[in-house]
Amino acid sequence: MPMKPENLTQQGRRLLDRRGFLKTAGLSTAALALAQLLDNDDLLAKDPRTVGGKVPIRPGVDPANPYLPRKAHFPMPARQVLVIYCPGAVSHVDTFDYKPALNKLHGKKPPSIPAVTFEGPTGNISRPFWKFRPRGQTGKMVSDLLPGLADQVDDFCFFHALTTETSAHPQGENFMNTGFTMEGFPSFGSWATYALGTERQELPAFVAINDPRGLARSGKNNFGNGFLPAAFQGTDFNSSNPPNNLQRPKNLSPEADRGTVELLKRLNARHLEKYPGDADLAGRIASYELAGRMQTSVPEVMDLAGEPEKVLEEYGVSGGSKLRGEYARNCILARRLLEKGVRVVQLFNGSDPSGGNGITNWDSHSNIADTHAMQAEIMDQPTAALIADLKRSGMLEHTLVVWATEFGRMPFLQANGTGRDHNPGAFTCFLAGAGVKKGFSYGESDEFGFKAAVDKTTVHDFNATLLHLMGLDHERLTFYHNGLERRLTNVHGHVVTDVLA
């Protein structure tokens, strides 16, 4: 039965008003005509999911089995990734980025450079604190600070014109590891495991091995899952601190333990039947099951007792500082995790806080000669041994090694005359292994190492290249969150094809 106007609400009567109807209809017709004209001229906004033909690829993740292996977007050699992260900002001009002009202008005021930087007034230009020498067959100039890594430069692919968006450590760590300066976004390792899963189910797909001194400045955000399913966050432990509650209580027999686990499985399965499609519940059940498998697999992988004495010597487990010994054991643990098929291993060399006698990372606003030397003694030999071990075993053919820090340091000293300030305008990272050129350098900073000058590379470009080496299109690997197709590279970045082997 038709509704009579007198029975309508005031709002309904307005909708039926003849004059209003004709006006609205006319505007709608005009809007349709305008849309057609704009579309003809290719000026109409497109569906963001299909701009440039880039339709998102959201992995089909089974919440009950989130770690099942998934196919890459295209074939590439990198099946696993080792990220060696050095918090605090390693000085590129004292390690891998040789600048002869610093020797020539040592002690002079820097030309055309701000009088004040991140932590105060600018001092004078300073030559490198360590001598640079040509290394390997390529003759790459590397300083004496890192002799172990210097011997391997023929296997490395350097990025010398990296830039970042911030000069603060927490935001810099976030940006390097998650693609955003703010917290709450998924880390690189989370994106990689969300896309690919893992070949082995008895260990986490993504493990973060923290420095013996603790977490880095941005804490667990460096390996967090953000808005991705919780299954893809990094599981953090190191050679001295295994995950909690791995050992069976002494008053619980193996039979009783297995019975408890089986009962829990049945109860969880029954509970899930009541709530089909509940991804959070299925994810929690999957995490419980992984924890059960880890009770056997983690103690086995952490048991370094079977490592030959020669290997322990190569890594520098003994004969150096206590911290070097602990970091060396972490490096061996990283190798063992990769051998067991863990997809992404993130190894930290540095923590928070820093300063004074409590130096815990590469931050060097004062006494850089001492602080960098201390960190190098911890990092260099074990890291070089780890990379050499991967090469010797053949694992480097399918493992991508990433050595990274959040930004560089200034070519001039701070006013105190003994340290270098933060430099977001230029810094160096390197890759090795699967899919990258060997003995190659990409990009250049200016003559002082102050700004990126040739082939400037953003962090988004760097991360896009890492994903590409794993067979993943950074523009199509997305997760729908808060109305947006989120990406590791936000809406930026391009693959640096010049570094691909």
Predicted regions and their residues:
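Ligand-binding pockets and gating/stacking loops
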Residues: 2-501
